[in-house]
C-alpha cells in the first residue's frame, strides 16, 4: 500500500486517445491453395503525419500481442565526390591511372618520372 502522504505525479500520456486507431486483423489468400493468412492493412493521411511518408523504411518489432512500427531515418545522401569515386572504381586500370594523374595535376603535385 502507498504512504498516506504520497502524491501521484501527473504525467502526459505518450499517445493521446485522439491518436489511437482501431484495426481488425483480416486475411489475405495465398495462391495456389488459397489458404488464408492473417493480414493487417494500414493506410491513411495520418501515417504521413506520424512520420511514415511513402517510401519510408520501417523497422518492425514483434512481441507476443504487440507489434511496434518505427520509421527509420532516411539514409544520408552520398556526396557527389563519393558517387564519382564509385564510378572511377568501375573504370579500367588505365583510365583509373589517368584519373589519378589528373588529380595529381589539379592538386599541384608534380609527377616524378
From Swiss-Prot:
Compartment(s): Cytoplasm
HAMAP family membership: Endoribonucl_SymE (MF_01193)
Major subcellular location class: cytoplasm
Pfam families assigned: SymE_toxin
Upper classification of the organism: Bacteria, Pseudomonadati, Pseudomonadota, Gammaproteobacteria, Enterobacterales
InterPro entries: SpoVT-AbrB_dom, Toxin_SymE-like, TypeI_TA_SymE
GO CC term, one of those recorded: cytoplasm
Role of this protein: Involved in the degradation and recycling of damaged RNA. It is itself a target for degradation by the ATP-dependent protease Lon.
Protein name: Endoribonuclease SymE
Assigned EC number: 3.1.-.-
Molecular function as annotated in GO: DNA binding; RNA binding; RNA endonuclease activity
Amino acid at each position: 500500500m502507498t504512504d498516506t502522504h504520497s502524491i501521484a505525479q501527473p504525467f502526459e500520456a505518450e499517445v493521446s486517445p485522439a491518436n489511437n486507431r482501431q484495426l481488425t486483423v483480416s486475411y489475405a489468400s495465398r495462391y495456389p491453395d488459397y489458404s488464408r493468412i492473417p493480414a493487417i492493412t494500414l493506410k491513411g493521411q495520418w501515417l504521413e503525419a506520424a512520420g511514415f511518408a511513402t517510401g519510408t523504411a520501417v523497422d518492425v518489432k514483434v512481441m507476443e500481442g504487440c507489434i511496434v512500427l518505427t520509421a527509420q531515418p532516411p539514409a544520408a545522401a552520398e556526396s557527389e565526390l563519393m558517387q564519382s569515386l564509385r564510378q572511377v572504381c568501375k573504370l579500367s586500370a588505365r583510365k583509373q591511372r589517368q584519373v589519378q594523374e589528373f588529380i595529381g595535376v589539379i592538386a599541384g603535385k608534380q609527377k616524378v618520372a
